[in-house]
Every structure is written in C-alpha cells, then in structure tokens.
Amino acid sequence: MWHWSLLCVFLLVPLANSTAPISFEANPDTKRLYDDLLSNYNRLIRPVVNNTETLTVWLGLKLSQLIEVNLKNQVMTTNLWVKQRWFDYKLRWDPEEYGGVEQLYVPSEHIWVPDIVLYNNWDGNYEVTLMTKATLKYTGEVFWEPPAIYKSSCEMNVEYFPYDEQICFMKFGSWTYNGAQVDLKHLDQIPGSNLVQVGIDLTEFYLSVEWDILEVPATKNEEYYPDTLEPFSDITFKLTMRRKTLFYTVNLIVPCVALTFLTVLVFYLPSDSGEKVTLCISILVSLTVFFLLLAEIIPPTSLAVPLLGKYLLFTMILVSLSVWTTVCVLNIHFRSPSTHNMSPLVRKLFLHFMPKLMMMRRTQYTLPDYDDSTPSNGYTNEIDVRDSISDFPSEFKDSQDGAYDNGMQNSVDSDNVIPRNLTPEVLQALRAVRFIAQHIKDADKDNEIVEDWKFVSMVLDRFFLWLFTLSCVFGTLAIICQSPSLYDTRSPIDRQLSEIPLRKNNFMLPPDIVRQVLT
C-alpha cells in the first residue's frame, strides 16, 4: 500500500511545480524611465515652462492614397499620415541614468498632443482615425505620426469635365490654441518663408488610376476669427490634380462623337426609304440617355455647364435641326404639279447654280417626240386626211375621191382645215387615240416637274450633308479643345516622387532587397 502512496507523491510534486506562475521581468531601465516620466505628468496642460511662452508644433502630411474625388458631393477622400513634432520639456531625461535608453514609445493618450484638426472637414470626423504611440527622445522631442482618413470639402470646377483639373485645399490648425500659444510650422519650412513647394510627402503614395497629382504646395497662414484677440495659425495644403481621361474618352466622348456624326447620315439616306425621320428620332433618344448618365456623374450646380454637357447640347441642337430640315426636304421631295408650281428663282438656284456648287450631275430627262401641229379641236389638215384616206380600203377611197377633191379645194380656202368626212366609228377611235396620246404627254410633263422637285430635294440633302459635316467637325474641335488640361505639359509629381511602383499584378521589391536575395 505504501508503494502506491509513494508513487502519488512523486507524480504530484512535478505537477505542482509546473502550475506555479512564471514571472518575466521587462527592461527595468525602460520601465523605470516610463514610471519616472509619466508618474506626475498631466497631459491636459500645454508643455511650456512659462504660460506666455509659445509652443512650436511642426506639421507635415504624408499622402498614402487618394481614395476618391467625388464631383457630385464635392468631397475629396484621402488616406494620410499626419506627421507632428514638438518639444516637451517634461519628457527629457539623461540616457546615462537609464541604462543608455535614448528613445521611448508611449501611448499618445498618456501625453499632451496638439489638437490639430482639419478645418474644411466634410463628414464631421475632425480627428485622426487611430491614436498610435508617440516616440519620445531624451532631448524632449516628441514625434507622432497617426494615420487618418479625411473627407475634405472641395469646391469642384466641372466646366471642363471630363478634361478637367481640380484644386483642393486641406486646412489644418489647432482647434483650441491661438497662434500665441501654439505656433504651427511646416516640417520643411524655410525661415523667412511661409511657402513650401512640395508640402506633402509622396514617397509612400499609391498612384491613382484616375488622377495625376501636379502640385502639392503648403502655405502657413494666420487668420483672425470673430471674438478672438490673437490670430490662429494654420497650414493649408493645396492639391492640384489632373484627371486621366482615357476612361471617359472611351466610354463617353467617343460614343457621343459617333452619335453626332450619325446625324450627317440622315441626309445621305434617300428620301424614298421613309426612314429619315426615324433615324433622327433614334439619335435624339440616344442623346437623352447620355444626358441622364451625365446627370448621375456631375454635381447639380448652375455655376457652369460641363464640357461634355456643352457637347451633348450642341449635338442635340444638331439633331433637332436635322429633324426640322428632314421634314422640309421630305415636303419638297413629294411635291407635285397639282399642288406646287416651281418659281423661276427656285429653278435657277436649285437646278442650275447649286448642283454645280455641290458637284452634282443630273441625268437628263427627255420627253417622247410629239407632233404639236395637230389641232385638238376635232379637225385635221390636208396631210392628215390624205394619210388617213391612204390607209383606208380602195373601195372607200375611190368612192370618196370626188368628195375629197371638192373638200380639198374648200379646205385650202379655209385655213387648210376641213371637217373629217369619216365614219363616226373611225372618228371616235381617232379621238380616243388622240386623248390617250395627250394624256400621256401631260403625264410626262407632270413627271418631269415631279422629277425636278425630287432633284431639288436631293440638292438640299447634299447641301445639308456638307453643312452638318462641317458643323460636326468644327463644333467638336471647338468645344473639346477648350479644356486647358489638353495643353498642360506638366509632368505629374506623384510619378516622380512615389517610391511605390505601379505594375500590372506584380509587386516589385526594392533593389537592395533584390540584391540581398540574389547574393
């Protein structure tokens, strides 16, 4: 029995030792430094020796990503690192007293930090996104670079959309302290100058697929507000951006230009097809769809009409005019002698002058030859009677010789015209034949007039074809070429300064790391 008791003792003793808490001691010098610095530290008091002393805060921005530039809501969304630096005399120490510790990382909630906010904020979130740790140096210098996603209000200029350039401002300053208490300066500011040409750090910037950044200057300002005795200092960052136009050119401009030049084909379509007005209305409906699409993109402002809106309006006016002119051309095309008479001026202008100007050649329309010397009043001349009788049978011809000779003599005395001494059946047949011939002759003359009206409509179609073609070409160039960004040859600064390459689905390592891997 005692064997089992001894075995249990040997098993329980190691188990008890294994469950005992194990303590690890941190860096004692760092812990002691942290306790000494922050034990009696008040983070609510501005860190100056004298209350009248001005605390200088150096401010800078590092742009990580241009998330969105919303024209409709007029807001710019950016991902930034807000770099801040200042001196806190209460956070100084001697490294020799703390084991050579020269740098310490502390939560930013435990020390005094300047209340730097974005003045022109859009969504109400004025502060930084994440309260990261601050870096303390033994000299009392404090570094703090919290990340933030800001939505800043930006007045967009849509006059030259989609070939536009936008200028947005980001105004940072202390919300509580005036310029006599906290003086803001840019990290790269030169003494005696308030302007920094490259005011935003773009070394960690991910290139945007929609915008090119041209300029990023920063300016220090001092401004008086109502009921304040001292000015408040702020730093205003200016972002000048130029839109990359490939997407809008392919998806908006090219289809719109194609619809514009479809208007020209209306006048090339023959009038007899009956589809001219249908084509015009179809183009007009397509332009209306483009207008609805544009209304979803641009902001509802009455200050300026965007470039694309001007072009769509110009195209819609052309299509409306094409509908009007097409109706007029069709009206002329289907005119007839019974409803309209062609005036000599119209005949001379559209049948002789303008065809030469429009380089048109008309096929000559010739009427059949008719004998206009035959009266149409039921009488005939001597030659007609002789020809008629010569065609009759010989019996009838012989029986009529005497009467014919007497009638012939009388006809000479009465304007060479005699009554027809033919049978009623023959006379009726002759009248019917002459009526048919006269009807065909009148129909041919009417057809000639109808063809003249059709040719006038063809001349008008050719004239409007050239007129609308020139209008489309010069109108397109005149409207689109208004944009100043088409003539801006400045190289994007983000491509020059960014150290993050943009490649197609490839991540490129820095050259020094590549060399280390290869060696």
Swiss-Prot record:
Segments on the Extracellular face: 19-244
Disulfide bridge positions per record: 154-168
Chief place of localization: membrane
Gene3D superfamilies xref list: Neurotransmitter-gated ion-channel ligand-binding domain (2.70.170.10), Neurotransmitter-gated ion-channel transmembrane domain (1.20.58.390)
Protein's cellular compartments: Postsynaptic cell membrane; Cell membrane
Chain ranges on the Cytoplasmic side, renumbered to this chain: 333-462
Tissue-specificity statement: CNS in embryos.
Glycosylation sites: 50
Swiss-Prot/TrEMBL keywords: Cell membrane, Disulfide bond, Glycoprotein, Ion channel, Ion transport, Ligand-gated ion channel, Membrane, Postsynaptic cell membrane, Receptor, Signal, Synapse, Transmembrane, Transmembrane helix, Transport
CDD domains documented for this protein: LGIC_ECD_nAChR_proto_alpha-like, LGIC_TM_nAChR
SUPFAM superfamilies, A to Z: Neurotransmitter-gated ion-channel transmembrane pore (SSF90112), Nicotinic receptor ligand binding domain-like (SSF63712)
Transmembrane segments: 245-269, 277-295, 311-332, 463-481
InterPro entries (alphabetical): Neur_chan_lig-bd, Neur_chan_lig-bd_sf, Neur_channel, Neuro-gated_channel_TM_sf, Neuro_actylchol_rec, Neurotrans-gated_channel_TM, Neurotransmitter_ion_chnl_CS, Nicotinic_acetylcholine_rcpt
Signal peptide (UniProt feature, chain positions): 1-18
Biological process per Gene Ontology, one example term: chemical synaptic transmission
Pfam families: Neur_chan_LBD, Neur_chan_memb
GO CC terms of this entry: acetylcholine-gated channel complex; neuron projection; plasma membrane; postsynaptic membrane; synapse
Membrane topology: Multi-pass membrane protein
Annotated function: After binding acetylcholine, the AChR responds by an extensive change in conformation that affects all subunits and leads to opening of an ion-conducting channel across the plasma membrane.
Family: Belongs to the ligand-gated ion channel (TC 1.A.9) family. Acetylcholine receptor (TC 1.A.9.1) subfamily.
UniProt protein name: Acetylcholine receptor subunit beta-like 2
Organism from which the protein derives: Drosophila melanogaster (Fruit fly)
